[in-house]
Amino acid sequence: MLPWKKHKFELLAEAPPRQASKPKGYAVSLHYSALSSLARACPEGALSRVGSMFRSKRKKLHITSEDPTYTVLYLGNATTIQARGDGCTDLAVGKIWSKSEAGRQGTKMKLTVSAQGIRMVHAEERALRRPGHLYLLHRVTYCVADARLPKVFAWVYRHELKHKAVMLRCHAVLVSKPEKAQAMALLLYQTSANALAEFKRLKRRDDARHQQQELVGAHTIPLVPLRKLLLHGPCCYKPPVERSRSAPKLGSITEDLLGEQLEQELQEEEEEEQPEGCPEEEENRAAEGDPAEEEAEAQRALVVAMHFECGDLLDTLENGRGEALGGGGGSLGPGAGPPPLLLGSASDMKAELSQLISDLGELSFGNDVRTLQADLRVTRLLSGDSTGSESSIEGGGPDATSATAGDSSRQADGASADEPHSG
């Protein structure tokens, strides 16, 4: 064997594997020292304290329940001239009841009461594709569980038409038992009161924030954080104006600089051509008259126009003003003189009219709140329908047809004067 190949095939023994040493990190020693010092400092209850350090903290979260839903039979609606007050729905409900043939004709629907308002969708599966109806909460002026027809729940809604026109309509639904109608009325009243209080609170907070921004600076006071808006959600009591159908559509305004320049030049030329003390100008000034009288005439015309638009809302005001004056005022008509409403100052008349219109936003309740809250049969139905509770809706049921014949005949006489629009 050659000398340089002598150790070529020597085999070396494999070294034994090293045992993994226990980690002696800083964190382990720190935890051990902290636990030992805690146990020495607090010998009583040390184990429970140590366990609470490593125990996960449990949090209780309130999950919002679904909005209460009821199965109803929608009977229809009828126009009314009273937005609130005891008995304001008697005539309209009588018309609806006679039109629906004592509750035998109607549309079966699912009615949901929420912070947005009253939502109704068709209950039949074949009619699910048909659009539902949403009655916004801030436009509902009155609700009641009718005492003459115990199974009928009615509400007055302020419909907004084109050109800011307003129409009051009474809607009525038939339910399976009187307690359900009372529960629906109580639930709508409570929901409206809570939503209105929340709307006022948010409005006051926004107003205070805007005032601080005006005083201190816009960049100093931040707006409401996005997380709070996502957590609580916007207030549904009164939606923004852009969602209203009567709101005007705003578009872009294009400026015509050339046209403005030409108009300004023509105006300057006319001023230069017409000298001071021109007799034509004096005649125009004499024809213009006193500006104070013009302003008074404009205010009278404005109040008369508002009176024609909101005539049904001003009946009580006119009657009270007529009694105070001894019945000396004339009737309001095309050829008549100014109404009794115009005898006061323009500011007082505007204030009274605005107060009447602003009061429409608050829901008026036609039943006794304390009596309904104390009735357990009513309060247990506030969460919605129970199983089999809609079994006797169709056909009116025995309680629904037990209305007095005198009321039905009396209301049927007035039904021909004003035909209701069924929904």
UniProtKB/Swiss-Prot annotation:
Coiled coil regions in record: none
Organism: Homo sapiens
InterPro entries noted in UniProt: Adapter_Engulfment-Domain, FAM43A/B_PTB, PH-like_dom_sf, PTB/PI_dom
UniProt biased composition (Low complexity): 383-393
Domain of life: Eukaryota
Protein name as it appears in the record: Protein FAM43A
SUPFAM superfamilies per the UniProt record, alphabetical: PH domain-like
Region entry Disordered, spans: 263-298, 321-344, 382-423
